[in-house]
Amino acid sequence: QLNWSNINEGSCQYAMAFSDNSNCNGFYAPNYGRNWGSTVSYAESHDEERVSYKVLNYGNSATLRNTSNNGQRMTRLGSLAAQMLTAPGPKMIWQFQELGNEQTTKKNGNENDTDPKGIYWNYLNDANRKGLYDSYSELCWLRRSNPDLFSQSATITMKCTASDWSAGRYTHLVNGG
Protein backbone atom coordinates (compact mmCIF):
# COMPACT_ATOMS: atom_id res chain seq x y z
CA GLN A 1 0.00 0.00 0.00
CA LEU A 2 1.31 3.42 -0.97
CA ASN A 3 1.21 6.52 1.20
CA TRP A 4 0.32 10.01 0.01
CA SER A 5 2.66 12.98 0.23
CA ASN A 6 0.89 16.32 0.01
CA ILE A 7 3.30 18.93 -1.37
CA ASN A 8 0.53 21.47 -2.10
CA GLU A 9 1.72 24.20 0.27
CA GLY A 10 5.31 24.16 -0.96
CA SER A 11 4.13 23.91 -4.56
CA CYS A 12 1.76 26.85 -4.22
CA GLN A 13 4.30 28.99 -2.39
CA TYR A 14 6.92 28.29 -5.07
CA ALA A 15 4.55 28.92 -7.99
CA MET A 16 3.21 32.11 -6.35
CA ALA A 17 6.85 33.33 -6.09
CA PHE A 18 7.06 33.30 -2.30
CA SER A 19 10.21 31.65 -0.95
CA ASP A 20 8.79 31.10 2.57
CA ASN A 21 7.45 27.54 3.00
CA SER A 22 8.29 26.72 -0.63
CA ASN A 23 9.93 23.36 0.10
CA CYS A 24 9.32 20.90 -2.74
CA ASN A 25 11.97 18.32 -1.72
CA GLY A 26 9.11 16.14 -0.44
CA PHE A 27 8.37 15.07 -4.01
CA TYR A 28 11.13 12.52 -3.31
CA ALA A 29 9.94 10.22 -0.48
CA PRO A 30 13.35 9.59 1.21
CA ASN A 31 13.71 13.36 1.72
CA TYR A 32 10.78 13.05 4.13
CA GLY A 33 12.15 9.94 5.84
CA ARG A 34 9.96 7.54 3.87
CA ASN A 35 11.04 4.43 2.00
CA TRP A 36 11.91 4.78 -1.67
CA GLY A 37 8.84 4.18 -3.86
CA SER A 38 6.47 4.07 -0.87
CA THR A 39 4.73 7.36 -1.52
CA VAL A 40 2.65 9.03 -4.24
CA SER A 41 3.50 12.71 -4.10
CA TYR A 42 1.34 15.44 -5.56
CA ALA A 43 0.93 19.19 -5.86
CA GLU A 44 -2.86 19.12 -6.36
CA SER A 45 -5.76 16.86 -5.38
CA HIS A 46 -9.48 17.02 -4.71
CA ASP A 47 -8.66 18.10 -1.13
CA GLU A 48 -6.23 20.87 -2.05
CA GLU A 49 -6.62 24.12 -3.93
CA ARG A 50 -5.28 24.19 -7.45
CA VAL A 51 -1.85 25.74 -7.78
CA SER A 52 -2.87 27.80 -10.83
CA TYR A 53 -5.86 29.20 -8.92
CA LYS A 54 -3.62 30.33 -6.09
CA VAL A 55 -1.05 31.91 -8.42
CA LEU A 56 -3.81 33.79 -10.23
CA ASN A 57 -5.47 35.04 -7.03
CA TYR A 58 -2.65 35.30 -4.49
CA GLY A 59 0.63 35.38 -6.44
CA ASN A 60 3.46 37.68 -5.44
CA SER A 61 2.78 40.62 -7.74
CA ALA A 62 6.14 42.21 -6.86
CA THR A 63 7.95 39.23 -8.38
CA LEU A 64 5.47 38.05 -11.00
CA ARG A 65 4.63 41.60 -12.14
CA ASN A 66 1.15 40.54 -13.27
CA THR A 67 -0.38 37.45 -11.66
CA SER A 68 -3.07 37.29 -14.34
CA ASN A 69 -0.40 37.00 -17.07
CA ASN A 70 -1.20 33.58 -18.47
CA GLY A 71 2.24 33.00 -20.01
CA GLN A 72 4.08 33.86 -16.84
CA ARG A 73 1.77 31.66 -14.78
CA MET A 74 2.18 28.68 -17.13
CA THR A 75 5.98 29.11 -17.02
CA ARG A 76 5.93 28.96 -13.20
CA LEU A 77 3.70 25.89 -13.33
CA GLY A 78 6.07 24.23 -15.81
CA SER A 79 8.99 24.85 -13.50
CA LEU A 80 7.01 23.29 -10.65
CA ALA A 81 6.20 20.29 -12.87
CA ALA A 82 9.93 19.81 -13.46
CA GLN A 83 10.56 19.75 -9.70
CA MET A 84 7.81 17.18 -9.22
CA LEU A 85 8.47 14.91 -12.19
CA THR A 86 12.27 14.78 -11.98
CA ALA A 87 12.02 13.38 -8.45
CA PRO A 88 11.93 9.55 -8.50
CA GLY A 89 8.83 7.77 -7.27
CA PRO A 90 5.13 7.74 -8.12
CA LYS A 91 3.39 11.05 -8.83
CA MET A 92 -0.22 12.14 -9.22
CA ILE A 93 -1.19 14.71 -11.84
CA TRP A 94 -4.72 15.76 -10.99
CA GLN A 95 -7.51 16.71 -13.42
CA PHE A 96 -6.02 19.09 -15.98
CA GLN A 97 -3.15 20.22 -13.75
CA GLU A 98 -1.05 19.74 -16.88
CA LEU A 99 -3.08 22.52 -18.56
CA GLY A 100 -2.93 24.98 -15.67
CA ASN A 101 -6.59 24.54 -14.71
CA GLU A 102 -7.48 27.33 -12.30
CA GLN A 103 -10.99 26.18 -11.33
CA THR A 104 -11.25 26.34 -7.57
CA THR A 105 -11.71 23.11 -5.63
CA LYS A 106 -13.52 24.91 -2.80
CA LYS A 107 -17.02 26.19 -2.18
CA ASN A 108 -18.24 28.39 0.65
CA GLY A 109 -14.71 29.24 1.68
CA ASN A 110 -12.78 26.11 2.63
CA GLU A 111 -15.36 23.37 2.06
CA ASN A 112 -14.20 20.86 -0.55
CA ASP A 113 -16.22 20.97 -3.75
CA THR A 114 -16.27 17.42 -5.08
CA ASP A 115 -18.88 18.20 -7.74
CA PRO A 116 -17.79 17.35 -11.29
CA LYS A 117 -15.48 19.96 -12.76
CA GLY A 118 -15.58 21.39 -16.25
CA ILE A 119 -13.44 19.83 -18.92
CA TYR A 120 -11.64 22.50 -20.89
CA TRP A 121 -10.14 20.86 -23.96
CA ASN A 122 -10.12 24.34 -25.50
CA TYR A 123 -7.17 25.09 -23.17
CA LEU A 124 -5.09 23.24 -25.77
CA ASN A 125 -5.82 26.11 -28.18
CA ASP A 126 -3.97 28.53 -25.88
CA ALA A 127 -0.25 28.51 -26.77
CA ASN A 128 0.85 29.05 -23.15
CA ARG A 129 -1.30 26.23 -21.80
CA LYS A 130 -0.25 23.98 -24.68
CA GLY A 131 3.35 24.77 -23.75
CA LEU A 132 2.67 23.66 -20.17
CA TYR A 133 1.00 20.50 -21.47
CA ASP A 134 4.03 19.82 -23.69
CA SER A 135 6.34 20.31 -20.69
CA TYR A 136 4.42 17.67 -18.72
CA SER A 137 4.47 15.38 -21.74
CA GLU A 138 8.24 15.72 -22.20
CA LEU A 139 8.91 15.23 -18.49
CA CYS A 140 6.79 12.05 -18.49
CA TRP A 141 8.65 10.89 -21.61
CA LEU A 142 11.96 11.54 -19.82
CA ARG A 143 10.84 9.33 -16.93
CA ARG A 144 9.65 6.51 -19.20
CA SER A 145 12.71 6.65 -21.46
CA ASN A 146 15.29 6.70 -18.66
CA PRO A 147 14.14 4.29 -15.97
CA ASP A 148 17.65 3.98 -14.52
CA LEU A 149 17.60 7.68 -13.62
CA PHE A 150 14.49 7.10 -11.54
CA SER A 151 15.41 3.71 -10.04
CA GLN A 152 16.16 2.99 -6.41
CA SER A 153 19.85 2.66 -7.23
CA ALA A 154 20.05 6.13 -8.81
CA THR A 155 21.68 8.97 -6.93
CA ILE A 156 19.54 12.07 -6.49
CA THR A 157 20.32 15.52 -5.19
CA MET A 158 17.36 17.85 -4.80
CA LYS A 159 17.80 21.52 -4.03
CA CYS A 160 14.18 22.66 -4.01
CA THR A 161 13.75 24.47 -0.69
CA ALA A 162 13.41 28.08 0.41
CA SER A 163 17.15 28.19 1.14
CA ASP A 164 17.79 27.26 -2.52
CA TRP A 165 15.70 30.18 -3.78
CA SER A 166 18.52 32.61 -4.61
CA ALA A 167 21.04 30.13 -6.02
CA GLY A 168 18.43 28.39 -8.18
CA ARG A 169 16.53 25.19 -7.64
CA TYR A 170 17.54 21.96 -9.30
CA THR A 171 17.37 18.19 -9.24
CA HIS A 172 20.48 16.22 -10.18
CA LEU A 173 20.05 12.56 -11.11
CA VAL A 174 22.86 10.06 -11.67
CA ASN A 175 22.11 6.82 -13.50
CA GLY A 176 21.64 3.94 -11.09
CA GLY A 177 21.86 1.14 -13.68
Describe each PLM feature range.
Residues 1-48, 65, 73-74, 79-86, ...:
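Active-site-proximal helices and loops of the catalytic beta/alpha 8
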